[in-house]
């Protein structure tokens, strides 16, 4: 069989496809964190109704998690195909990352934690679950902090792609808090 970098061709192809799926997930990730509130000026400026914005958010979430699931499972299959020691080795590289080690700033345990948090968030956002247990869906959506935090530890460069969403989310949160404080202050004044 053909070899590439000392690996069978199919294994090299799987590595590359898994890598490109991870990199490709950054595009929907960069837009996914744009806040969904009925009063969002950003969505109104884009000409989208709240319902259309929610549909876009769901589609981006499904696309991103589909790509990240292929990324995670693809690498796990590739590592298990190379040797039974590679998967545990890759997942215990937490303390060995750096210039002199082979992981080159990719922290796979953090990636696994981020992916598992993303899977839980994704599962609770499915229509059949969301409609029955909206309270759990809403609380589980706070896992986005774990997802983005450990994703940034996994591959720090992803911060560049998540930064616009974080800025929009923070600005929206600040606006909502400002409105609440103003309403409470007005209510106390009367």
Mark where each language-model region is.
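FNR-like FAD-binding dehydrogenase module
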Residues: 1-190
């Amino acid at each position: 069989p053909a070899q590439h970098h000392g690996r069978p061709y199919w294994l090299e192809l799987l590595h590359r496809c898994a890598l490109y799926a991870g990199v490709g997930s950054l595009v929907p990730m960069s837009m996914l964190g744009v806040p969904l509130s009925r009063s969002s000026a950003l969505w109104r400026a884009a000409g989208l109704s709240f319902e259309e914005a929610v549909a876009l958010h769901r589609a981006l979430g499904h696309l991103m998690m589909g790509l990240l699931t292929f990324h995670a499972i693809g690498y796990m299959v590739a590592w298990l195909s190379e040797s039974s020691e590679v998967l545990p080795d890759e997942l215990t590289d937490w303390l060995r990352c750096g210039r002199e080690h082979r992981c080159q700033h990719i922290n796979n345990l953090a990636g696994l934690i981020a992916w598992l948090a993303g899977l839980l968030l994704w599962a609770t956002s499915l229509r059949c679950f969301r409609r029955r247990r909206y309270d759990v869906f809403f609380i589980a959506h706070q896992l986005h902090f774990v997802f983005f935090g450990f994703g940034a530890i996994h591959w720090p460069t992803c911060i560049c792609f998540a930064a616009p969403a974080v800025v929009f989310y923070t600005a929206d949160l600040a606006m909502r808090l400002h409105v609440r404080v103003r309403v409470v202050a007005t209510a106390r004044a009367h």
